[in-house]
């Protein structure tokens, strides 16, 4: 399971000209599901995302996690993160999870974060989305479990 996280000062997702998810300070999480992923990996990755210290403390060091910084999550499904790009000029998605598997783990990821008290907004699974963000830093990390 893969999460590309970006520290943002604001981010939003639009589907059919309607904003369906928006946050101010927090993390935009692009979430990719691979074939071998399961609930255990999902919980490990969600915990890591919420605990990852990417927000600055009073000394300007990245010492604070999402909760300590008072941030929110915007979680967007992104199957292209599971692409194999090693060979050729076209990505292969054979390692990506099935749509059913990905939807289930995506929904569980969001629910897990919410049960931990994190304000969590979402995109729309498998929709054509327009994602707008102001990357704060920029600070971007690729997390994989």
Swiss-Prot record:
Single Gene Ontology BP annotation: tRNA metabolic process
Top EC class, one word: hydrolase
GO cellular component, one term: cytoplasm
Lineage: superkingdom: Bacteria
UniProtKB keywords: Cytoplasm, Hydrolase, RNA-binding, tRNA-binding
Chief location: cytoplasm
Subunit structure, interactors included: Homodimer.
Protein name: D-aminoacyl-tRNA deacylase
